């Protein structure tokens, strides 16, 4: 076949939508539509969170995460160089949700009892609306890894610091006593919210929050305040 005939044949094949096996035609994207990098990263974090909660860190696999996300494994590794890096990114995202929720709640009022209420409410809201984050932070199966343990400490210590700052500002207590109260309040809020969720929400969230607040306020009402 002459060069002219070959050229005509190739043009005919292109116009008809057909292609020879050896034609240099891009393969279709079998893994889904291409997303902007930030959007893809966010999607991978959501999918990875599901897998880590379902499987635990050790049983979770990068193959499964990539498959659920509809991407190839090399694409996953373009965003996260290892399973540990991915896990830490997932954990960091949930920690930020918890800490920002507590800070925002405490900034909404200057009334001390109401502050207690919104702080307790923030933990119940987090456990209800971000149960994956709750599992990863407070029921973590991988705290033997120093970087993971550090992230978990950030979650609790940041919340304690926020409560401690208000107690210190509003009371005549020395820093050690004020921090002990903050530790107790955060621990009680987490444990009560955890029980409420694990018991399949036996009472309404508002009743659970108010019960926790009443118990805590019984002790806090005896703390000397420099201002109301």
UniProtKB/Swiss-Prot annotation:
Chain intervals for the UniProt region annotation (Disordered):
1-39
Primary role: Transcriptional activator that plays a central role in sensing mycobacterial long-chain fatty acids and regulating lipid biosynthesis. Activates the expression of the genes encoding the fatty acid synthase (fas) and the 4-phosphopantetheinyl transferase (acpS), whose products are involved in the fatty acid and mycolic acid biosynthesis. Specifically binds to three conserved operator sequences present in the fas-acpS promoter region.
Stated consequence of mutating residue 123 to A: Maintains a normal dimeric structure. Has significantly lower FasR-DNA-dissociation responses to the ligand
User: Residues annotated as DNA-binding region?
Assistant: 61-80
Its gene name is fasR
Q: What happens when the gene is disrupted?
A: Inactivation of the gene is not lethal for in vitro growth but leads to complete rearrangement of lipid composition of the envelope, with phospholipids, mycolic acids, sulfolipids and phthiocerol dimycocerosates relative abundance severely altered. As a consequence, replication of the mutant strain is impaired in macrophages leading to reduced virulence in a mouse model of infection. The mutant resides in acidified cellular compartments, suggesting that the lipid perturbation caused by the mutation prevents M.tuberculosis inhibition of phagolysosome maturation.
Protein name from the UniProt record = HTH-type transcriptional activator FasR
Q: How is it regulated at the activity level? A: FasR:DNA binding is regulated by long-chain acyl-CoAs (C14- to C26-CoA), which act as effector molecules that modulate the affinity of FasR for its DNA binding sequences and therefore modulate the expression of the essential fas-acpS operon. FasR activity is not affected by mycolic acid biosynthesis intermediates.
Got a GO cellular component term for this one?
plasma membrane
What the entry lists under Pfam families is as follows:
TetR_C_46 (PF21943), TetR_N (PF00440)
Give GO BP annotations, semicolon-separated: regulation of DNA-templated transcription
Question: Where is the HTH tetR-type domain positioned along the sequence?
Answer: 38-98
Share the domain note from the entry: Contains an N-terminal helix-turn-helix (HTH) DNA-binding domain and a larger C-terminal regulatory effector-binding domain (EBD). A long tunnel traverses the entire effector-binding domain, enabling long fatty acyl effectors to bind. When the tunnel is entirely occupied, the protein dimer adopts a rigid configuration with its DNA-binding domains in an open state, leading to DNA dissociation.
């Amino acid at each position: 076949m002459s060069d002219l005939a070959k050229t005509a044949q190739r043009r005919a094949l292109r116009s008809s939508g057909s292609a020879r096996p050896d034609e240099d035609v891009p393969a279709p994207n079998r893994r889904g539509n291409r997303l902007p990098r930030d959007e893809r990263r966010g999607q991978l974090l959501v999918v990875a969170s599901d897998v880590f909660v379902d499987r635990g860190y050790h049983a979770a696999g990068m193959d499964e995460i990539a498959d659920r996300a509809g991407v190839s494994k090399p694409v996953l590794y373009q965003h996260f160089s290892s399973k540990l890096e991915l896990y830490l990114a997932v954990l960091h995202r949930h920690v930020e949700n918890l800490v920002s929720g507590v800070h925002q709640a405490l900034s909404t009022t200057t009334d001390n009892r109401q502050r207690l209420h919104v702080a307790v409410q923030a933990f119940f809201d987090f456990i209800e609306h971000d149960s994956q984050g709750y599992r990863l932070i407070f029921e973590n199966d991988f705290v033997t890894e120093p970087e993971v343990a550090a992230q978990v400490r950030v979650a609790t210590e940041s919340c304690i610091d926020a409560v401690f700052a208000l107690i210190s500002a509003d009371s005549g207590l020395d820093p050690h006593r004020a921090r002990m109260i903050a530790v107790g309040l955060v621990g009680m809020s987490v444990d009560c919210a955890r029980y409420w969720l694990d018991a399949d929400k036996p009472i309404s969230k508002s009743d659970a929050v108010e019960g926790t607040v009443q118990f805590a306020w019984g002790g806090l009402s005896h703390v000397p305040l420099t201002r109301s």
